[in-house]
């Protein structure tokens, strides 16, 4: 079976649609595994929620998902993110809010634990160093953990001696999930932050035990036009073309 590992859609409909089209082009998957932040930053929160719900999927809550329904204080967000969260909250239907409200913060599926931030702090913690990642291995019981939040495609591997190593997930290069425990981030769909503006996602093949990353170009300008139309912060508009 194949599963799409997706994260940080961030209300970017053009990017999400491009990723879903690519998944279908590759033969489809059994299920989407979404690592949170469906909404926030981008201009199409309702349509992205609707599109995700049209597919068989599991999903954990991200910090932007919770902030948009009043479950996290906006004081914890930077000013531009807070502005986008307030705007997002005004767009959501009651059905959208109920869907986001019912998202769990942790899901266990087979050998995987799914969280948005980290297994230690599922909503907020960023895993961007071997130090924080190494400490996180003690907070989940499965062999592997899938995370989002940083928008950077990466694998953290726990060695037999207890040390933690870091490796970037490279485009179209399969990563075999072997004996070592790993924390895997498939990168961000709606707002990549590794210097590559293309949408990022991965497919996991449960028969070959391989995770493969894909980078998908999309119409960035179309998203920027919609963001500008809704008076979302210009810094958020510009960063899409920079991949930062």
Q: Which residues does each PLM region occupy?
A:
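Active-site neighborhood of phospho(di)ester-bond hydrolases with catalytic His/Asp-centered motifs
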Residues: 6-7, 32-36, 58-63, 115, ...
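Short beta-strand scaffold segments in enzyme catalytic cores
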Residues: 106-108, 153-157, 200-204
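Anionic-ligand binding region
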Residues: 130-174, 179-183
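Beta-strand-turn-beta hairpins that frame and shape the catalytic cleft
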Residues: 1-4, 108-114, 177-182
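Acidic, His/Gly-rich catalytic cores of divalent-metal-dependent hydrolytic chemistry
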Residues: 160-244
